[in-house]
Amino acid sequence: MANYFNTLNLRQQLAQLGKCRFMARDEFADEAGYLKGKKVVIVGCGAQGLNQGLNMRDSGLDVAYALRKEAIAEKRASWRKATENGFKVGTYEELIPQADLVVNLTPDKQHSAVVKAVQPLMKEGAALGYSHGFNIVEVGEQVRKDITVVMVAPKCPGTEVREEYKRGFGVPTLIAVHPENDPKGEGMAIAKAWAAATGGHRAGVLESSFVAEVKSDLMGEQTILCGMLQAGSLLCFDKLVSEGTDAAYAEKLIQFGWETITEALKQGGITLMMDRLSNPAKLRAYALSEQLKEIMAPLFQKHMDDIISGAFSSGMMADWANDDVKLLNWREETGRTAFENAPQFEGKISEQEYFDHGVLMIAMVKAGVELAFETMVDSGIIEESAYYESLHELPLIANTIARKRLYEMNVVISDTAEYGNYLFANAAVPLLKEKFMDSLQAGDLGKSIPGSAVDNAQLRDVNEAIRNHPIEAVGHKLRGYMTDMKRIAVAG
């Protein structure tokens, strides 16, 4: 199989990278109706598999789980989760032949084996669904021409997909139809019904492409969403401790600081996050972020280039074939870091203290979000897609670190995201140690910026630069859509 993206000509590549349309609420007037009375069989019962299935069932769909014979015989976690929630469970041979829609929600590295197993069992004219397009785009999976291939990709972890649905809402979602596999022209109707069944239509749906989803998703998770948080955690902790800060305090400031800082980001973008700082601290955070962007731009661009060319995917798939040797070694190295093994701080840190003592962390967030967004847009990805794969998901990933440090983040994210995270962090940490960390001043981290006079013109210009960045404009628009839709959902 050949990388699908690399088989396209330049015009086709640009068209698919740039596919992105915010869908109107009235396009989902039929909600999940197109799939009512049809059989949906989900393969895989992890976080996305279970929680999407629960939502789909609550939306009136007929949902069952197809698991491997061994998983059923040995009553593994997937079997227990499905049966304990009252779902019908069977083998591939028992359930796939009757399915109108087979939804593959297994990990990326299992997709080829799963598709190879289920495709011969699927009835003519059935549909195959994904929530991430890696298998189609990067692996280049060839699917029978009578099968419709669609994607519904919630921009949140599976647990959030369920919790938002239970609140009467949903999570922003990308949907797509594979242009090589839409024989009956019903792909969009299937994708819309599936998205509505998970509640995504109540939070905002982008009509995208498999290519745009994969390339932007890989870029976001490797850089700002995971790689920057990992690199920032390790660098900031080591810097604090080297300057005499109590290790327990340093650990807590970082572990819970990302979540506190990005909560402001979620509510009001980079503008609100920066507004939480005093004026002298804001000016310093802005200056630090500009330095960071200049230093890290080539690294962000290299990751984007390797994602576009397929070099990243081929390297990772080679590690899959080698029993994940690199991934497992990097995971073990992370577990041995001083940050992961620091004692817990028993004292309290106020919400404002996380901002006042975390100026460098705020600068890292700002620089990482803007760089990821800019690099994606420069590569042909539309701004809305770039926003969802950078700023939007960051608070959700920061929350995992607040639970159990980097260990939890790397457990929750996919193996694909984890591999890319280590690639980025392993390059970013030495780069910033060499070119940036030694230039920090008192008040950048662990202490408050000393009070000082502020030049009005400088503050005006910095405020305008922050608020006029393109990600702030698109973020304001998309957060507005979500707020409006939530009001409609609650009222309804």
Swiss-Prot record:
One of its GO terms (cellular component) is cytosol. The lineage of its organism: Bacteria, Pseudomonadati, Pseudomonadota, Gammaproteobacteria, Enterobacterales. GO terms for biological process: isoleucine biosynthetic process; L-valine biosynthetic process. This is Ketol-acid reductoisomerase (NADP(+)). Its EC number is 1.1.1.86. The active site is at H132. Binds 2 magnesium ions per subunit. Its cofactor is Mg(2+). Mg(2+) 1 binds at D217, E221. Residues 209-344, 345-485 form the KARI C-terminal knotted domain. The keyword Amino-acid biosynthesis applies. It catalyses: (2R)-2,3-dihydroxy-3-methylbutanoate + NADP(+) = (2S)-2-acetolactate + NADPH + H(+); (2R,3R)-2,3-dihydroxy-3-methylpentanoate + NADP(+) = (S)-2-ethyl-2-hydroxy-3-oxobutanoate + NADPH + H(+). One of its GO terms (molecular function) is magnesium ion binding. Keywords: Amino-acid biosynthesis, Branched-chain amino acid biosynthesis, Magnesium, Metal-binding, NADP, Oxidoreductase, Repeat. Belongs to the ketol-acid reductoisomerase family. Pathway: Amino-acid biosynthesis; L-isoleucine biosynthesis; L-isoleucine from 2-oxobutanoate: step 2/4; Amino-acid biosynthesis; L-valine biosynthesis; L-valine from pyruvate: step 2/4.
